[in-house]
Amino acid sequence: MASPSKGNDLFSPDEEGPAVVAGPGPGPGGAEGAAEERRVKVSSLPFSVEALMSDKKPPKEASPLPAESASAGATLRPLLLSGHGAREAHSPGPLVKPFETASVKSENSEDGAAWMQEPGRYSPPPRHMSPTTCTLRKHKTNRKPRXXFTTSQLLALERKFRQKQYLSIAERAEFSSSLNLTETQVKIWFQNRRAKAKRLQEAELEKLKMAAKPMLPSSFSLPFPISSPLQAASIYGASYPFHRPVLPIPPVGLYATPVGYGMYHLS
């Protein structure tokens, strides 16, 4: 049977750790209760003096923790590899929110686009792009068809043009009535014939220029042949029965200027 002093020692405040209520007695039931209380104390405070003085083995309740951590570490990689699939399967609620917000945003953007694109109030009216038109010259709608002249009319017009290229008003009226033509037709025919004659004249002049153009420029042409006696007399003087010795003359080149001909020594 425990003495009162020992019971008071159990409740002494100097001891570290929480107070332990004394058991009922020294019987077998009291020993089991003290052991259970001690086990609870050790499990609740693993770093207390009693736990350090005990067998220094981790309590049975704490033993499953490393296994759980190991299992968590083993399953961490598959969870990371699975990605968002598991989270989407377990939490379908947040999936609805993005779609709802996206739909709201799209509606808001459509409203904003309609507000920004409203013509007449906030933006200038859109330009209507005209389709690309053909660049060919279009004839007038009220243009008269081209009148075909007969052979006799053409011959008469050509003879009249050779006689006189410009007709007065009276001459044109008389000539048009003789050919059963209008004054406008005669006037236009003479205008076209004068333009044609001018083109033909320019072509003939160009052809004559090309035919008269020599192979060498005219500035290098000599006024007399080199082998003529006039050229020898002009260079060496008059010819005598007895020829005097001729001094050596350096080679010379002839060149022409707009005024006349000149000579220069070739180096």
Swiss-Prot record:
PROSITE patterns xref list: HOMEOBOX_1, HOMEOBOX_2
DNA-binding region: 142-201
Single GO MF descriptor: RNA polymerase II transcription regulatory region sequence-specific DNA binding
Gene Ontology BP annotations: embryonic morphogenesis; negative regulation of DNA-templated transcription; osteoblast differentiation; regulation of transcription by RNA polymerase II
Subcellular location: Nucleus
CDD domains, alphabetized: homeodomain
One Pfam family linked to the record: Homeodomain
Keywords: Developmental protein, DNA-binding, Homeobox, Nucleus, Osteogenesis, Repressor, Transcription, Transcription regulation
GO cellular component: nucleus
Skewed-composition ranges (Low complexity): 62-71
SMART domains registered for this protein in UniProt: HOX (SM00389)
Top-level taxon: Eukaryota
Region described as Disordered: 1-71
Entry function: Acts as a transcriptional regulator in bone development. Represses the ALPL promoter activity and antagonizes the stimulatory effect of DLX5 on ALPL expression during osteoblast differentiation. Probable morphogenetic role. May play a role in limb-pattern formation. In osteoblasts, suppresses transcription driven by the osteocalcin FGF response element (OCFRE). Binds to the homeodomain-response element of the ALPL promoter.
Similarity comment: family membership: Belongs to the Msh homeobox family.
Listed name of the protein: Homeobox protein MSX-2
The organism of origin for this protein: Pan troglodytes (Chimpanzee)
Gene that specifies this protein: MSX2
